Amino acid sequence: MNLNATLIGQLIAFAIFVAFCMKFVWPPIIKAIEERQRSIANALASAEAARKEQADTKALVEQEITEAKMQAQQIIDLANKRRNEILEEVKVEAEATKAKIIEQGYAEVEAERKRVQEELRVKVASLAIAGAEKIVGRTVDEAANSDIIDKLVAEL
């Protein structure tokens, strides 16, 4: 029957061991496990918050990129509009300059034509008088010559 007494002794030793473990060993282990659970839960919450923040930031960045693209397109459109305005201004200015140069050319040609026409009138009148003198055979005085030339020039 030593078996029973040994069994009871082992049972008592085991009960003391369990009581000792429950009093001194289990609380730190349970505390460590609970602390680890809290840190894992906090890490998961932080990861979820970071994922949400990353998604929000990504959406914000995409929105800012879209706005920047729209602003860039507006700037390009404005630059193209300004370029077209400048080209139109230059074209109008060039047309005005061209018209002015053509007008000056016509005025110069007209003035030259009148000058040459006047010279031609004077020469034709002089030739007519010279021809008339040869036909008549006598010289007309200078005053009469001048009157005749003026009348011929006026008629031409």
Swiss-Prot record:
It is a single-pass membrane protein. GO terms for cellular component: plasma membrane; proton-transporting ATP synthase complex. Keywords: ATP synthesis, Cell inner membrane, Cell membrane, CF(0), Hydrogen ion transport, Ion transport, Membrane, Transmembrane, Transmembrane helix, Transport. It comes from the Bacteria. One of its GO terms (molecular function) is proton-transporting ATP synthase activity, rotational mechanism. The keyword S-adenosyl-L-methionine does not apply. Its main location: membrane. Coiled coil: none annotated. The chain crosses the membrane at residues 7-27. It is found in: Cell inner membrane. InterPro entries: ATP_synth_B-like_membr_sf (IPR028987), ATP_synth_b/b'su_bac/chlpt (IPR002146), ATP_synth_F0_bsu_bac (IPR005864), ATP_synthase_B_chain (IPR050059). It holds the Pfam family ATP-synt_B. HAMAP family: ATP_synth_b_bprime (MF_01398). F-type ATPases have 2 components, F(1) - the catalytic core - and F(0) - the membrane proton channel. F(1) has five subunits: alpha(3), beta(3), gamma(1), delta(1), epsilon(1). F(0) has three main subunits: a(1), b(2) and c(10-14). The alpha and beta chains form an alternating ring which encloses part of the gamma chain. F(1) is attached to F(0) by a central stalk formed by the gamma and epsilon chains, while a peripheral stalk is formed by the delta and b chains. Belongs to the ATPase B chain family. F(1)F(0) ATP synthase produces ATP from ADP in the presence of a proton or sodium gradient. F-type ATPases consist of two structural domains, F(1) containing the extramembraneous catalytic core and F(0) containing the membrane proton channel, linked together by a central stalk and a peripheral stalk. During catalysis, ATP synthesis in the catalytic domain of F(1) is coupled via a rotary mechanism of the central stalk subunits to proton translocation. PANTHER family: ATP SYNTHASE SUBUNIT B, ATP SYNTHASE SUBUNIT B', CHLOROPLASTIC. This is ATP synthase subunit b. It comes from Pasteurella multocida (strain Pm70). The gene is atpF.
